[in-house]
């Protein structure tokens, strides 16, 4: 306790002495005003210098924006077999790890740009003094002394002006980086952010661009060429000026020799080599953009990654694209020979959906589409016309108990003021459902839609991701206020290939971030929309559309089913607004649409859906030459094939005669020529006073036995062929007369 009090007294005495000394000193300075001002000036300079020094040393954090140290990186899009499918970027940069860069490449950059990189703390003061001396001599800022860290700081956080203030900020940022990051961190970031001309950023991208190889495979001379380019990328690019590139590369090799990285003999040998660059890579093919736009929009919606982030984030995306199909689809869409329209501004879209995965194998959004354009025709809605009939009417009717050979009435009808006519204004009376679909009858479609119920049809559309707010019978003919996209239509029709199961289509299979971490997404839905028998019957009927119906024009040798569709132009009589064909092969579904961005008096099609049929069949023919499309559809287990149609014969040779039966009883035999179709049922009639009377039936046979014929009078007989599929009868045969006495 005593010692503590003594310490306190000592401290108080020292404080009093200091205060006394300060007062005496100030009195002396007051008597000599010049000395007071000099002392204050020196103290101010020391104080300000100290503040400035500590601000430079520790103020770099105010300049460094760590968000900018996350470099924009190219998102790579590739197919399932690893083929390059496209790139998305703001800066074309493939990031690499420092461990992947060979030592001889690192030494090329260090020897050229910052020989003392591993020994300084961000600023090389020896180089600074040399540069300051030259600046003073020239009375201007003529030489830089930037280290690799300073270059990185300038490129990431500052501008390119040559002011002392910018240089001070550069020093501050560099010293901050050196205190907070390792040399390897700085060097890796530096190599990844460099620009190499031609829109190429980062050493990995440059390696692939100039040499078609990974940075890990670069040779000494190749690394030297890249190291030399960064001083003036456009000046030293081998694709712009080969002579400059060689000279600059040799300068770098000399620097490596001077720094002790190369022996003299090795230097001379390397300087004698050519540049070894590959042919300058071509720009991305035009046919890729259409698909990449679908990828971007899908990732935005399913993965919640914005377009900007996708173009900066360095993701790796695997897609369902088939490059051959995509190219073929593009070449056919851009071929003007298929189009018959009022002018050459006509547009088209083709979408191909894989049967098994529902993956988008090809998507063309227009004849000249580029990423970001508003009118991607594969993603824009169009009125579907008659392509909606199977989806909203005929297959739902099969689900509700109708059969492909159920009879429907084909005649002009009026439904509370809504008059329905066939496109050709021809009517056939009662016809089978399958025939109504094959011939794309409007009257039967609307009548059947009315019979099963509008809400029933809409329910099936909704389950096929084809919801509509419309409520009228016009839905049955595709007369919608909005419509559907070619992607939606191809996806919906793909259900017929999959036993009635609807699967959401998609372009993206998987996506990983720049660190290789997989990003989860919303799983596509799978819904049993139709019974597999209904789906199979519909597929069979759609095959007949191609062989015998509205899609029978033009040739295609493979298995093909499909449905045509067209919509009327609103103002030009007889013109078409939208032309469709949805085709199904055993392996995939293809949706083709032809029309205009805006349809008006000057923009219309002069021909209907046949031009979409022509384009599709030509496309399939070319695809089949590249990769064989299977020749038969997969029949599901436990289903029946659609029966072949029956043509009833004209019977003109009915004959009647007597013969002996058992126990010598008299009998009569009727005979006639039969059809080769043994499914036909033959009704046998006997004419009586009350008219004709059905006395028997036989199936597939050309004879009938009358066991107890009348022998006392002449009897007349007829035969009528019956179609068992529709229960329709044909024409009566010629009469056959039977009499024992004549």
PLM regions: where:
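Conserved catalytic neighborhood of penicillin-recognizing serine enzymes
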Residues: 137-161, 402-457, 472, 502, ...
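Juxtamembrane regions of bacterial inner-membrane/periplasmic proteins
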Residues: 2-334, 338, 360, 674, ...
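Soluble, non-transmembrane domains of envelope/secretory-pathway proteins that act on or interact
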Residues: 1-2, 17-24, 30, 254, ...
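Active-site SXXK
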Residues: 108-110, 256, 329, 358, ...
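A penicillin-recognizing enzyme superfamily signal
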Residues: 319, 323-339, 363, 370-374, ...
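Short active-site loop at a secondary-structure junction
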Residues: 94-99, 344-347, 371-391, 404-407, ...
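Short, well-structured active-site flanking segments
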Residues: 118-127, 203, 263-265, 371, ...
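Mid-domain, small-residue-enriched loop/turn segments at the edges of structured enzyme/sensor domains
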Residues: 419-421, 453-491, 500, 504
């Amino acid at each position: 306790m005593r010692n503590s009090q003594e310490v306190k007294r000592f401290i108080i005495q020292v404080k009093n002495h200091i205060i006394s000394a300060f007062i005496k000193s100030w009195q002396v300075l007051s008597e000599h005003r010049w000395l007071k001002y000099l002392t204050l000036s020196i103290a101010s300079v020391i104080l300000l210098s100290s503040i400035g020094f500590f601000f430079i040393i520790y103020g770099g954090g105010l300049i460094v924006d760590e968000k900018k140290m996350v470099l924009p990186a190219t998102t790579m899009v590739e197919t399932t077999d690893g083929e390059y499918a496209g790139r998305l970027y703001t800066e074309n940069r493939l990031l690499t790890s420092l461990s992947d860069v060979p030592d001889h490449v690192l030494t090329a950059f260090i020897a050229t740009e910052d020989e003392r990189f591993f020994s300084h703390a961000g600023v090389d003061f020896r180089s600074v003094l040399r540069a300051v001396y030259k600046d003073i001599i020239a009375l201007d800022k003529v030489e830089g002394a930037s280290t690799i860290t300073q270059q990185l700081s300038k490129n990431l956080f500052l501008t390119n002006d040559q002011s002392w203030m910018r240089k001070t900020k550069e020093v501050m940022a560099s010293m901050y980086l050196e205190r907070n990051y390792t040399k390897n961190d700085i060097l890796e970031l530096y190599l990844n952010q460099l620009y190499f001309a031609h829109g190429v950023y980062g050493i990995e991208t440059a390696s692939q661009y100039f040499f078609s190889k990974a940075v890990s495979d670069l040779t000494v001379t190749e690394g030297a060429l890249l190291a030399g380019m960064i001083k003036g990328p456009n000046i030293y690019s081998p694709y712009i000026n080969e002579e400059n590139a060689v000279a600059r590369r040799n300068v770098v090799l000399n620097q490596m020799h001077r720094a002790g990285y190369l022996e003299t003999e090795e230097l001379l040998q390397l300087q004698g080599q050519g540049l070894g660059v590959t042919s300058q890579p071509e720009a991305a093919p035009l046919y890729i953009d259409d698909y990449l736009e679908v990828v971007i929009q899908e990732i935005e919606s399913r993965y919640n990654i914005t377009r900007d982030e996708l173009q900066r984030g360095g993701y790796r995306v695997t897609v369902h694209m088939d490059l051959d199909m995509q190219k073929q689809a593009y070449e056919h869409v851009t071929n003007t020979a298929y189009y018959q329209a009022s002018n050459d501004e006509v547009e088209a879209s083709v979408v191909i959906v894989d049967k098994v995965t529902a993956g988008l194998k090809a998507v063309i959004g227009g004849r000249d589409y580029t990423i970001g354009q508003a009118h991607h025709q594969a993603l824009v809605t169009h009125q579907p016309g008659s392509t909606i009939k199977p989806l909203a009417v005929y297959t739902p009717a099969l689900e509700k108990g109708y059969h492909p050979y159920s009879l429907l009435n084909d005649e002009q009808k009026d439904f509370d003021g809504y008059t329905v006519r066939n496109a050709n204004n021809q009517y056939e009376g009662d016809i089978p459902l399958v025939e109504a679909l094959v011939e794309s009858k409007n009257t039967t479609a609307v009548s059947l839609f009315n019979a099963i119920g509008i809400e029933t049809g809409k329910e099936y559309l909704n389950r096929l991701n084809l919801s509509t707010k419309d409520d009228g019978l016009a839905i049955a003919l595709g007369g919608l206020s909005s419509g559907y996209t070619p992607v939606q239509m191809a996806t919906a029709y793909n259900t017929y290939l999959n036993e009635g199961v609807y699967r959401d289509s998609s372009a993206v299979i998987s996506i990983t971030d720049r660190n290789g971490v997989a990003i989860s997404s919303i799983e596509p839905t799978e819904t049993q929309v139709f019974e597999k028998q209904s789906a199979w019957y519909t597929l069979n009927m759609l095959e007949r559309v191609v062989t015998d119906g509205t899609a029978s024009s033009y040739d295609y040798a493979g298995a093909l089913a499909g449905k045509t569709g067209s919509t009327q132009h609103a103002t030009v009589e007889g013109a078409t607004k939208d032309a469709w064909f949805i085709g199904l092969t055993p392996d995939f579904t293809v949706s083709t649409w032809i029309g205009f961005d805006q349809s008006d008096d000057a923009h219309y099609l002069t021909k209907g859906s046949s031009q979409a049929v022509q384009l599709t069949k030509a496309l399939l023919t070319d695809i089949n030459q590249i990769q064989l499309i299977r020749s038969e559809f997969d029949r599901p287990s436990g289903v029946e094939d659609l029966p072949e149609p029956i043509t009833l014969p004209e019977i003109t040779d009915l004959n009647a005669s007597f013969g002996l039966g058992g126990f010598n009883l008299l009998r009569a035999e009727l005979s006639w020529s039969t059809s080769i179709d043994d499914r036909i049922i033959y009704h046998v009639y006997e004419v009586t006073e009350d008219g004709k009377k059905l006395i028997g039936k036989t199936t597939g046979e050309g004879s009938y036995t009358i066991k107890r014929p009348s022998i006392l009078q002449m009897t007349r007989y007829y035969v009528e062929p019956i179609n068992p599929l529709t229960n329709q009868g044909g024409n009566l045969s010629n009469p056959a007369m039977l009499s024992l006495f004549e």
